């Protein structure tokens, strides 16, 4: 690649196109590589100075990156905007991860220009389901799995969500602890009623897996209930993204390996590698958060949330992949 050789058979079309105008380098190039796996497929990140190359095995095809030393000023990361649905499964011990209600629904978007957003979907939103009929938005996964959950979110929001990642409670805690916790600033003290009244104090701190889960799941003690809970989930996701950005792209393979051990996804290795690398290109000032809200109502004996104009405005705002 650095010597100017033909990349037609060793790169994805988008990466090959980006590197077509590269300037070759004479002499040795010193690089560092880290290897991991995504759902059984080998992945690698190679860094050489400010250059970053993303590759997918087993034949090690270059699928993206950025190469300022070669005169390639624009990152090749699959384009944008793109969205992925992060699902937190309510599965308990012995229950299938992908066929229980979704406890967390967060749409993560990047615009391909250094901006992005995280949009929460409250569990009680009463919407048309991709599996038929109407119901609470998180029930789609019970009837049709994560793909049905994605389809429901797509038809409600109008966003062409690419795919999903799913984690359970235990898996979430394990990943957070393996990564050394999540540094975050908690705006207001929270008492997690569902977690033996665990207290998450206000201020800057690093949350353990158990603390992060308690903060992300608490609803009953919050003045805005499920909306506040969804907001907290977005805060945790953004805090994790900031930590990942500070660790640098070289840490991506280890993170993907950790997730693959406990989570599920329909994203290919190329899709997840370029998407997570895209998160490293984000500017914190160009990333926003939002929660799809609505009016409270009833469907029989069920308490529900009915989407209103504010939520539809949020969906429209997110169509460029940016909520800042």
Descriptions of predicted regions:
Residues 1-324:
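Non-catalytic, solvent-exposed segments at the cell envelope interface
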